[in-house]
């Protein structure tokens, strides 16, 4: 396999995943909605349940040595930009040379440098983005969309600095490896609200504040007025809240539409226990005008972001970039 590069040159197809930026039962993990074309559904179902034992142990090898034992070829597109020392969710897509998403049992290995001892494997289950039909927008992940799921691994970075990653996906009887790199900072250097901290009491856009002009505060097609009934400032600290920052129509990736649809599906199940709020990203829905005030108050520089906040007003989970049905639901449960 090629030498692990210090910076991954990301192809356009990868940007479709990274541009914006778990487990357990839910109202359906979505695999039944994944298209069956070309055996995709079967691949995603297998990819949803990897185990560490499905992958080679590191046995004291460096990350480069692990990579050299596998076949190269695909690229990895990270779905986030924010990583801190300690526990992190690493979300990503794996894309082949034709720009198609690769689905199979997947895991992640990490190390501070390619020549350092590898850590892992950390299983990365595929999390389905395809909602039930009743919750799909025009921007949705659908039964005809081959972008059906996103991978997510729980990893721990022990120190700040650059870290090299190696994603490994089972395909065609072999192992396909794809390298990347992330920058990790101390929590004190991350000014985005973290788990355990009080969420900023921001005024989010509502149907009332928009004087009934739903399209001015929601680029989803059709709009989702259910997610714009209450301002975050009016409910935070009184009951659990799921606050989603996303722009379905203007997102630089293909994930803002699906995550907003997932919010609607979660509201249908948990709306009696939690308030679900969607906040658009850009002033006047124009990227040239900059970010809306709530995003500035949360110190966000990418999107989508999900913040789940408990009844005490403190963040119980935060998710950046792409997240599917299981991950969203598990986040919701942290505040219930």
Label for each model-derived stretch:
Residues 20-32:
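Bacterial lipoprotein signal-peptidase II cleavage site
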Residues 213-218, 224, 232-252:
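Short active-site neighborhood of thiol/selenol oxidoreductases, capturing the structured segment around
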Residues 188, 193, 208, 212, ...:
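Thiol-/selenol-based redox modules, centered on thioredoxin-like
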Residues 29-158, 162-214:
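Contiguous segments within soluble domain cores/interaction surfaces
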Residues 253-270:
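Typically the conserved alpha-helix immediately C-terminal to a functionally engaged Cys/Sec
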Residues 271, 277-303, 308-315, 325, ...:
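Thioredoxin-like thiol-disulfide oxidoreductase module
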Residues 245-248, 279-282, 320-322:
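Active-site-proximal beta-strand/loop segments in catalytic clefts of secreted hydrolases
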Residues 1-18:
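Sec-dependent bacterial lipoprotein signal peptides
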């Amino acid at each position: 396999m090629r030498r692990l590069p210090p910076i991954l040159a990301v192809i356009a197809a990868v940007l479709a995943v990274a541009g914006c930026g778990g487990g357990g039962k839910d109202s359906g993990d979505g695999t039944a909605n994944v298209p069956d074309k070309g055996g995709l559904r079967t691949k995603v179902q297998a990819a949803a349940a990897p185990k560490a034992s499905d992958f080679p142990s590191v046995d004291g090898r460096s990350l480069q040595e692990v990579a050299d034992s596998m076949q190269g070829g695909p690229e990895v597109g990270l779905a986030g930009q924010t990583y801190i020392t300690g526990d992190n969710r690493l979300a990503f897509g794996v894309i082949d040379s034709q720009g198609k998403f690769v689905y199979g049992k997947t895991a992640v290995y990490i190390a501070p440098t390619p020549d350092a001892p590898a850590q892992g494997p950390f299983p990365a289950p595929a999390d389905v983005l395809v909602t039930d039909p009743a919750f799909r927008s025009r921007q949705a992940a659908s039964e005809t969309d081959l972008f059906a799921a996103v991978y997510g691994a729980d990893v721990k970075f022990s120190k700040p600095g650059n870290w090299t990653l190696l994603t490994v996906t089972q395909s065609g009887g072999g192992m396909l490896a794809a390298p990347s790199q992330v920058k990790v900072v101390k929590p004190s250097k991350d000014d985005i609200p973290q788990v355990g901290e009080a969420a900023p009491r921001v005024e989010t856009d509502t149907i009332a504040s928009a004087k009934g002009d739903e399209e001015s505060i929601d680029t989803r097609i059709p709009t989702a007025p259910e997610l714009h009934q209450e301002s975050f400032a009016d409910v935070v600290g009184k009951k659990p809240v799921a606050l989603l920052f996303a722009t379905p129509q203007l997102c630089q990736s293909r994930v803002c539409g699906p995550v907003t649809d997932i919010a609607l599906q979660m509201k249908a199940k948990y709306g009696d226990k939690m308030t679900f709020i969607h906040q658009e990203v850009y002033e006047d829905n124009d990227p040239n005008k900059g970010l809306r005030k709530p995003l500035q108050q949360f110190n966000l520089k990418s999107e989508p972001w999900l913040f789940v906040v408990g009844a005490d007003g403190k963040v119980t989970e935060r998710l950046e970039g792409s997240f599917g049905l299981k991950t969203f639901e598990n986040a919701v449960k942290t505040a219930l």
